Amino acid sequence: MSSNLSNSQILNNLLEGRNLDELTSRSLMQRWLNDEISDVETGAFLSALRAKSSTGVELSSMAEELLNVCKLPVARPNLYLVDTCGTGGDGANTFNISTAVAFVAASCGVKIAKHGNKSASGKVGSADVLLNLGLDLNCSLEKVITAVSEIGITFLFAPVWHKSLIKLAPLRKTLGIRTVFNQLGPLVNPLRPNAQVLGVASEDLLEPMGRALLKMGMNRAIVVYGSGGLDEASLQGENKLVLVENGELRFSKINISNFNHENIANEKLVVSDQESNEEILKSVLNGSGQISHINVVALNSALVLWAAGIEDDLNEGFNKALFSINQGDPWKKFLLLKNYLQTN
């Protein structure tokens, strides 16, 4: 079913600050997928949605339409899957924390299906760093899916699964602003995870993203806005959280000082180039990294362990993540995934 509103009527509603209902939101995404919206109209729609701010209904409805056209080559594993994909776009140029978190959580027993892409605004996105470390993201889609059952973690490179959106990439790059598609990225993991920790680059996205996850049936999730504007939980100070659990949203806060560790400025997490990002990621995973790098990964990993239902006590989750890192288990998990994806 499609909305009877024309493109210009939908655009006018957005420009007047009116929220779109579920039917109209789905119809808008269908029109993008069916090439029924021109480049000029697309630019106007994306700018209008950005100016208005997207709602949970708009985000969940558009995400569902994208997922409906994303077909899996083999059956989804019957596992409790967790994603650590966030919006990106905080512009802070930190090392790739969420990617490190994925391997730490996997080494603690979480089944990770990480959705990701190349960099939006940072030095390197999750796909960039994994490719540079030798992970084969061009292997068969079947192998990508079976990896989560065999190894306990997999990585889904967004452009491979959402080919219909590739045509919008040049226009989005030309616009040069964060758009609704940055917000949709974490919501359209083809394996439809049961739980998620989702970092946002803007505080006003906390509730809409939480409501979108709730509407999409997420069992447990945490949306996090980090102190100092990070799209991860930060060591700098108080981090704001929206927790999705038992069909409800609740708001919370977390600070590394709660774990008897000192606050550290976000500048300590910044990387200058691609090579240093890879070095830091590897050093965290093998347990040889700086304490600030290890602590920020352990803090975010504790959130993932909560979402996975493995550790309800965040202090216990933090300590569990630290222990795994100190043992070098996350790096072993990375090597297992690398070898698995390379074999025929």
UniProtKB/Swiss-Prot annotation:
Name the UniProt record assigns to this protein: Anthranilate phosphoribosyltransferase
Cofactor binding note: Binds 2 magnesium ions per monomer.
GO biological process: L-tryptophan biosynthetic process
One Pfam family cited in the UniProt record for this chain: Glycos_transf_3
Physiological role: Catalyzes the transfer of the phosphoribosyl group of 5-phosphorylribose-1-pyrophosphate (PRPP) to anthranilate to yield N-(5'-phosphoribosyl)-anthranilate (PRA).
InterPro entries: Anthranilate_Pribosyl_Tfrase, Glycosyl_Trfase_fam3, Glycosyl_Trfase_fam3_N_dom, Glycosyl_Trfase_fam3_N_dom_sf, Nuc_phospho_transferase
Residues noted as binding Mg(2+) 2 in the record, renumbered to the chain: 231-232
Naturally occurring in which organism (per UniProt): Prochlorococcus marinus (strain AS9601)
Pathway: Amino-acid biosynthesis; L-tryptophan biosynthesis; L-tryptophan from chorismate: step 2/5
Amino-acid positions noted as binding anthranilate 2 in the UniProt annotation, renumbered to this chain: 172
Quaternary organization: Homodimer.
Family named by the database record: Belongs to the anthranilate phosphoribosyltransferase family.
Entry GO MF terms: anthranilate phosphoribosyltransferase activity; magnesium ion binding
Gene3D superfamilies with a match to the protein in the record: Nucleoside phosphorylase/phosphoribosyltransferase catalytic domain, Transferase, Pyrimidine Nucleoside Phosphorylase, Chain C
Cofactor(s) this protein requires: Mg(2+)
Gene: trpD
Reactions listed under catalytic activity: N-(5-phospho-beta-D-ribosyl)anthranilate + diphosphate = 5-phospho-alpha-D-ribose 1-diphosphate + anthranilate
UniProt entry keywords in alphabetical sequence: Amino-acid biosynthesis, Aromatic amino acid biosynthesis, Glycosyltransferase, Magnesium, Metal-binding, Transferase, Tryptophan biosynthesis
Disulfide bond residue pairs: none
EC numbers: 2.4.2.18
